[in-house]
């Protein structure tokens, strides 16, 4: 058995914590209580990646875990961390920030049990629902609002280029960092460009992509670019300038068939305005006016 495990890719405790998006202390608790596949070699805990992924799938099938795929969001990360602290290791929620469109795809292919998204439909001006109608037409689902958040331009402190909006950014050839294809932020940028009748080739750095809002902010902070598109909180965290462009709706989508399972009901119960207000206390740029509201049932 040990020889077979050695032939697999083995993860360290830190690598496993990053994969599961957990604190390293939680990994040791999983070893003790959760039965996660592991082996100890020369005094170090190692984890066979294939067996770990299969262990996750089995727990999902037993309705002990759920996987949420979709958009990157800092407040959602806080909510999931808070949930896990209270219920770990009885149930764990895994979070894969692959982008809004990829999240819908994961849900439609039954690779995830929920998805989170912020997709602006350019024809209707509506968030999320038109995309769900197109991509989940054969499934029944429930849409819950998590929160609204401000999206805009993240700029160097004191805005040395004097950028006031997208027009200035393009005309002054400011160095830009983009988000990954399929993310709601990327689609929002493409919508803005179409409204202004700019072409993507006019943006310096349009093909320079990162996966998260924080990465956008860090690229600006380190002087690698002049501007990026992201949420207000990142600019606050890194003491950067921010020009708001849009308040967007950030929703959670759950298949109807999974609504009754214990871990899903517990998680939905945690989407309580009072609880979210506590978690969002130090996060500017968020509005909880519709938090927890069921927006749609198919």
Feature roles, as predicted:
Residues 92-99, 200-213:
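Short beta-strand-to-loop elements that line the ligand-binding cleft
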Residues 9, 143-150, 236-269, 290-291, ...:
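Periplasmic-binding protein-like
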Residues 157-164, 198-199, 257-263:
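Short helix-loop capping/hinge motifs at secondary-structure junctions, enriched
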Residues 103-150, 220:
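Short beta-strand-centered segments that line the small-molecule binding cleft or hinge
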Residues 146, 155-176:
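Flexible hinge/capping segments at coil-to-helix
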Residues 64-72, 167-187:
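Short loop->beta-strand "edge-of-pocket" segments that line small-molecule binding or catalytic clefts
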Residues 1-102, 111, 135-141, 166, ...:
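N-terminal hydrophobic or amphipathic helices and topogenic motifs
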Residues 118-132, 217-246:
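A ligand-binding cleft/hinge motif common to bilobed small-molecule-binding domains
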């Amino acid at each position: 058995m040990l020889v077979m495990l050695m032939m697999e890719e083995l993860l360290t405790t830190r690598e496993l914590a990053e994969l599961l998006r957990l604190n390293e202390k939680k990994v040791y608790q999983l070893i003790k209580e959760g039965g996660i596949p592991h082996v100890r070699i020369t005094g170090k805990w190692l984890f066979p990646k294939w067996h770990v992924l299969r262990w996750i799938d089995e727990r999902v099938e037993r309705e002990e875990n759920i996987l949420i795929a979709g958009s990157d969001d800092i407040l959602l990360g806080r909510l999931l961390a808070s949930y896990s602290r209270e219920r770990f290791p009885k149930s764990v929620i895994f979070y894969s920030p692959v982008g809004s469109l990829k999240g819908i795809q994961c849900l439609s292919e039954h690779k995830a049990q929920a998805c989170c998204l912020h997709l602006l439909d350019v024809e209707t001006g509506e968030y999320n629902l038109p995309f769900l109608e197109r991509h989940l037409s054969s499934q029944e689902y429930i849409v819950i609002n998590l929160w609204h958040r401000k999206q805009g331009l993240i700029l160097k402190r004191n805005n040395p280029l004097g950028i006031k909006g997208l027009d200035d950014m393009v005309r002054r050839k400011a160095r830009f960092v983009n988000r990954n294809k399929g993310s709601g932020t990327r689609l929002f940028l493409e919508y803005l460009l179409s409204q202004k009748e700019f072409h993507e080739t006019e943006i310096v750095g349009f093909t320079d992509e990162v996966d998260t809002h924080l990465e956008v902010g860090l690229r600006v902070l380190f002087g690698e670019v002049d501007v990026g598109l992201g949420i207000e909180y990142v600019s606050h965290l890194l003491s950067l300038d921010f020009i708001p462009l849009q308040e967007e709706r950030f929703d959670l989508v759950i298949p109807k068939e999974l609504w009754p399972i214990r871990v899903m009901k517990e998680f939905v119960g945690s989407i309580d305005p009072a609880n979210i207000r506590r978690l969002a206390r130090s996060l500017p740029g968020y509005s909880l006016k519709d938090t927890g509201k069921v927006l749609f049932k198919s």
